[in-house]
C-alpha cells in the first residue's frame, strides 16, 4: 500500500472560481472601502477609476483601448460583447470546453447569425487555428477553464483581419501573455485568477471594436444593462468608472488590493512566473503518476492555471458514472483531510480533477 503523505499545501483553496485570495490577504484590507456612499459620488468614482487604471497598468493594456467595469462577472462581459458587436458578418466560433460551448449556443440558438462556422471539438484538444476565416468575426476562450487546454499564443490571428476577435480570457489574464494587438474585445472576471469577489466583470475594447460600435446597430434589441452606445456614440462614462448598474464598493476595494499585490510582485509577468512555477510542481507529479494524466493532450496547449486531470490506466476503464463518483470521493477525502478544497472538475466536463494555480 502507498504510505499516507505527511506534507500538506500551505493553502488548501484550489477552486477555479472564486479563486483563493492572494497570500497574506486579510479582511482588514477592506477598511478603506467606500461603504455607505454612492458609486456616483466623487469618492466612489475615484475608487472605480483607480481600479480601471490599475487594470490597464498591470496588464499593460494600450492607451487607446477602453476598459469598463460591467455586471454579471465574465459571463456578463462576454455576453455584452457578443450582443453589441456580433451580427454584421458571420462568426467563427471556437469551442473546446464548457464555456466556449455556451458561447457557441448563444451564437447558434440565440443570436442566430447566418453563415457562421462552428469549430467545436472534444475536451482535451483545441480546434485547428489555421482553418479560421478572419473575414468573419471570431469568438474563443483563450484558456479552457474546464479542459485545461489553451491557445499557445496569438500568432494565428492576423494583423490585417477584417473581423473582430472576441476573447473570453477570464482564466488567462495574469497567467498567460495576451497580445492586445490581436484582441478586439477581451473579458475577464475578478473572481478568476486574482481571487477577487464574484459578480463583477471587465470588458476591454480595441479601437476597431469601438469603431464598429459607433457604426453598426444589431438587428436585435439590446437590454439596458448591456447598452454601450447612445445615439450611435460610445457611452464614455462606462469606461471611466460610471458603471451601468451599482457595483459593490466592498468588492471594488478587494479588486484594488489584488491589483496592488500583482504590482508588488512585478506585474502580470510576476503572476505568470508564479503560475508557471506552481504548474511545474503539478506536472512533475502527473508525469510520475500511474493513475492520472492531463485532460489536455498537447504539451503546447497545457494550461498553467486551470489544470484539468483525467483518470488513467484501470480507472479510465470505469464508466462515466463511476468515474464521477470516484472524483467526488477523492474530493471529499481531500476536503476532510484538509489537504485540498474544491478540486473536482466542472459537472459538464469529463470526470476528473481541476486545480487553479497562481496564488497557491
For each of these PLM feature ranges, what is it?
Residues 28-80, 84, 96-98, 102, ...:
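Conserved N-terminal alpha-helix of the aminotransferase class I/II PLP-enzyme fold
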Residues 293-333:
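Conserved PLP-binding catalytic core of the aspartate aminotransferase-like
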Residues 54-62, 260-296, 333:
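Conserved PLP-dependent catalytic core of the aminotransferase class-I/II
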Amino acid at each position: 500500500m502507498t504510505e499516507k503523505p505527511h506534507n500538506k499545501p500551505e493553502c488548501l483553496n484550489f477552486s477555479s472560481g472564486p479563486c483563493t485570495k492572494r497570500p497574506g490577504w486579510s479582511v482588514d484590507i477592506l477598511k478603506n472601502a467606500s461603504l455607505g456612499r454612492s458609486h456616483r459620488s466623487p469618492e466612489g468614482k475615484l475608487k472605480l477609476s483607480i481600479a480601471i487604471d490599475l487594470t490597464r497598468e498591470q496588464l499593460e493594456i494600450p492607451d487607446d483601448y477602453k476598459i469598463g467595469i460591467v455586471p454579471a462577472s465574465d459571463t456578463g462581459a462576454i455576453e455584452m460583447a457578443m450582443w453589441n458587436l456580433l451580427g454584421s458578418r458571420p462568426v467563427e466560433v471556437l469551442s473546446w470546453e464548457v464555456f466556449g460551448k455556451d458561447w457557441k449556443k448563444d451564437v447558434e440558438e440565440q443570436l442566430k447569425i447566418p453563415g457562421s462556422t462552428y469549430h467545436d471539438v472534444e475536451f482535451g484538444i483545441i480546434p485547428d487555428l489555421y482553418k479560421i476565416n478572419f473575414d468573419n468575426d471570431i469568438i474563443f476562450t483563450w484558456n479552457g477553464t474546464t479542459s485545461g487546454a489553451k491557445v499557445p499564443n496569438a500568432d494565428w490571428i492576423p494583423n490585417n483581419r477584417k473581423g473582430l476577435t472576441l476573447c473570453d480570457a477570464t482564466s488567462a489574464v495574469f497567467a498567460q501573455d495576451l497580445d492586445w494587438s490581436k484582441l478586439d474585445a477581451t473579458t475577464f472576471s475578478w473572481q478568476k485568477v486574482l481571487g477577487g469577489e464574484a459578480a463583477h466583470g471587465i470588458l476591454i475594447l480595441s479601437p476597431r471594436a469601438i469603431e464598429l460600435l459607433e457604426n453598426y446597430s444589431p438587428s436585435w434589441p439590446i437590454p439596458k444593462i448591456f447598452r454601450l452606445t447612445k445615439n450611435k456614440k460610445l457611452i464614455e462614462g462606462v469606461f471611466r468608472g460610471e458603471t451601468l448598474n451599482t457595483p459593490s464598493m466592498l468588492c471594488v476595494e478587494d479588486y484594488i488590493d489584488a491589483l496592488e499585490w500583482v504590482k508588488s510582485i512585478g506585474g502580470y509577468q510576476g503572476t505568470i512566473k508564479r503560475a508557471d512555477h506552481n504548474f511545474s510542481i503539478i506536472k512533475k507529479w502527473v508525469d510520475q503518476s500511474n493513475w492520472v494524466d492531463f485532460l489536455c493532450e498537447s504539451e503546447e496547449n497545457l494550461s498553467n492555471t486551470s489544470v484539468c486531470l483525467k483518470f488513467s490506466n484501470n480507472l479510465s476503464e470505469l464508466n462515466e458514472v463511476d468515474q464521477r463518483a470516484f472524483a467526488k470521493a477523492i474530493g471529499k477525502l481531500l476536503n476532510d483531510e484538509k489537504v485540498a478544497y474544491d478540486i473536482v472538475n466542472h459537472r459538464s466536463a469529463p470526470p476528473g480533477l481541476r486545480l487553479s494555480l497562481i496564488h497557491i
